[in-house]
Amino acid sequence: MGRRDSGRAVAQRYRGVTRGVTVIACLMVVCACVGLCDATGQKRHSWEAPGCHLVGHTRVVRIPDCVPFQITTNACRGFCVSYAIPSPYQTLVYNPNHIITSRAACCDIIDTLDIPVQVTCVDGVREIVFKSARSCACSICRRE
């Protein structure tokens, strides 16, 4: 009876291991299908790398009584470092309520340029000026 019991224990362990391997294999397939795992290690877009990057942004503009038009301007896209840590002792001595110290940077437009566009409207041609990002950088996050 001892051999039969140990055989069952081995079979149960084997089933548990194969289930674990199956789950891992399924996760790898899902990950690959979704595109989260890139075997080459390369990013599909420049903005997927850490930092703040200049990217083109195309949209259709509709102005009442004017012909709709498409325009491409530059925007900033990416991600910057942010974190929160328990406040250092010196900070707590100065302000006991300041328990957490946070640092954050946001992807932001640093400089812009004007893009003039001639738009055909019912009352004639109008010149409308759009802003386009010239440069981008990680900077202090602001509330607006």
Curated annotation (Swiss-Prot):
Belongs to the glycoprotein hormones subunit alpha family. GO terms for cellular component: extracellular space. Heterodimer with GPHB5; non-covalently-linked. One of its GO terms (biological process) is cell surface receptor signaling pathway. The lineage of its organism: Eukaryota, Metazoa, Spiralia, Lophotrochozoa, Mollusca. It comes from Conus victoriae. Its main location: secreted. One of its GO terms (molecular function) is hormone receptor binding. Disulfide bonds join 52-107, 66-121, 76-136, 80-138. Expressed by the venom duct. Transmembrane segments: none annotated. It is found in: Secreted. This is Thyrostimulin alpha-2 subunit. Residues 1-41 form the signal peptide. InterPro entries: Cystine-knot_cytokine (IPR029034), Glyco_Hormone_Alpha (IPR052680). Keywords: Disulfide bond, Hormone, Secreted, Signal, Toxin.
